[in-house]
Amino acid sequence: NNYQMPVITIDGNIGSGKSTILDKLQKNHNQIVSFEPVQEWETYLENIYNNDKGYFDFQLKIYLDRAFIQTRSNSILYMERSPKFTYETFIKVYKDKFTPQEYSILEHLYNNVDQKYNKSVVEPVLYIYIQSSPNVSYNRIKERDRESERIIDYNLIQLLHNKHEECYDNISSTGGLPTFKINSDDKTPDELAELIINYVQGNT
C-alpha cells in the first residue's frame, strides 16, 4: 500500500538557512528531504532580479515543481518551503508585478485547487518557521554569493521578513495547524537540525 507521506515544511526568508538545515537533517539524522531545485530556477531568478521580468512564469514554475508530491511511504518528508508561505510571502510582495489576471490565476491555484482536486496540494502536518533577522539573512545571501542573488537589495529582504512574520502569526493564531518557530540568528545548522528532530519526536 501507498500511504500519504506526512510532510513537514521548513519555511523562512531567503538566507534564513533552510537548505543548510535540510542538508543536516538528511546527512546527520537520515531524514527524507525535498530541496527547492534552485539550480533549475537560476534563469528565472536572474530574469527577475536583473531584468525585473518573468514573475508570473516563475511563480507558475514553482507551483508546478513544488505544490504536489508523490505518495511514497509513511515516512516523514521534510520539504523546503510550503505552498502557503510561498503564496503569503513572495506572491503578495510581488503582487504589482502580475497583471490582475495573472494574480487571479495564482490566487485560485493556491486557494481553490485543494478543494477542487481533493486536497492534492501539499498540506503539512507541521509548519517549521526558521526566523532570522533581515540583517543576518542579508549577510548570509552576500556570503554565499549565488549569481542570481547578487542584485537582491536589503529592502526586499525586509519586506519578505515582514510577510513571513505575518504568515507565521496568522497560522499559529488560528490554532488549526501545528507550528514551531526557531530563531536561526545565533544557532549553528547542526543545533537547528537537532532542535527540529527533538521537537518532531516529542510532538508527532
Predicted features and spans:
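Hydrophobic anchor at the beta1->P-loop junction of P-loop NTPases
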Residues: 10
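P-loop (Walker A) phosphate-binding loop of NTP-binding proteins
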Residues: 13
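Short amphipathic alpha-helices and their capping/turn segments at secondary-structure boundaries
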Residues: 63-77, 112-118
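A glycine- and Lys/Arg-enriched "phosphate-lid" helix/loop adjacent to the NTP-binding pocket
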Residues: 88-166
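NTP-dependent small-molecule kinase module
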Residues: 138-204
